[in-house]
A protein has these predicted regions:
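Short beta-strand segments
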Residues: 43-45, 66-71
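Short, conserved beta-strand element in jelly-roll/cupin
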Residues: 33-37, 47-65, 102-104
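Short acidic-glycine-tyrosine-enriched beta hairpin
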Residues: 8-9, 68-86
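Structural motif
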Residues: 15, 54, 61-63, 70, ...
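Acidic/histidine-enriched, glycine/proline-rich intrinsically disordered or flexible terminal extensions
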Residues: 114-146
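Ligand-binding loop in jelly-roll beta-barrel domains
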Residues: 63, 83-110
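A short glycine-rich, His/Asp/Glu-containing loop-to-beta-strand
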Residues: 9-45, 51-52
C-alpha cells in the first residue's frame, strides 16, 4: 500500500489513514495517521483491554485526557496509553493537528473507523446515534466510558 492509494476515512471532521494494518504485520501492530481540525472535540471517552495505544504528535497540539489527567501532545511528543486506561482527545487549539497512532497488538483496523463513519453519516449533520456508536465500539473491543 502506498501513499497514493491510502484510503482516507472521514468521521465528521476527523480524517484517518492506515499506514499499516494488523494483517500486514502478522497481527503485531497497526499504525494510522489522523488529522483533527482546530476546535474539534472527539471521540467518546473509552478504554480498551486488549491493546496499548501510543500517540506520536506530528503537527499542532491535541489535548489527551487519560484517566482524568489532561496532557498536551505536540510535534515530536509521545503519549503511551496502557490497556484499560479511560481516554479521549480534543483539539481546543487554534491550529489543526495530526498524530500517528501505534496499536499493539494490531487488532484495531480500519473497519472500526468505517463503521463509526457510517453511523455519523447516517445522522445527516445531526447528532449521531450514541447507542449505535457504543455498539460499534464494543464490537471492536472498545468500552465506552459513558
Amino acid at each position: 500500500m502506498t501513499a497514493t492509494t491510502r484510503e482516507e476515512i472521514r468521521i465528521g471532521p476527523l480524517a484517518i489513514r492506515f499506514l499499516l494494518e494488523g494483517e500486514q504485520s502478522g497481527g503485531s501492530v497497526s499504525v494510522f495517521e489522523f488529522d483533527v481540525p482546530a476546535g474539534a472535540n472527539v471521540p467518546v471517552a473509552h478504554s480498551h483491554d486488549a491493546y496499548e495505544e501510543t500517540i506520536y504528535g506530528l503537527s499542532g497540539v491535541m489535548t489527551w485526557t487519560v484517566d482524568g489527567v489532561p496532557t498536551d501532545v505536540g510535534p515530536g511528543e509521545v503519549l503511551c496509553i496502557r490497556r484499560g486506561a479511560v481516554h479521549r482527545f480534543e483539539n481546543g487549539h487554534d491550529a489543526d493537528a495530526s498524530a500517528l497512532a501505534v496499536v499493539t497488538p494490531g487488532i484495531l483496523g480500519p473497519d472500526y473507523f468505517r463503521e463509526v463513519a457510517d453511523v455519523v453519516a447516517a445522522a445527516a449533520g445531526g447528532p449521531p446515534d450514541v447507542a449505535a456508536i457504543g455498539e460499534v465500539m464494543r464490537r471492536h473491543g472498545l468500552t465506552p466510558a459513558v
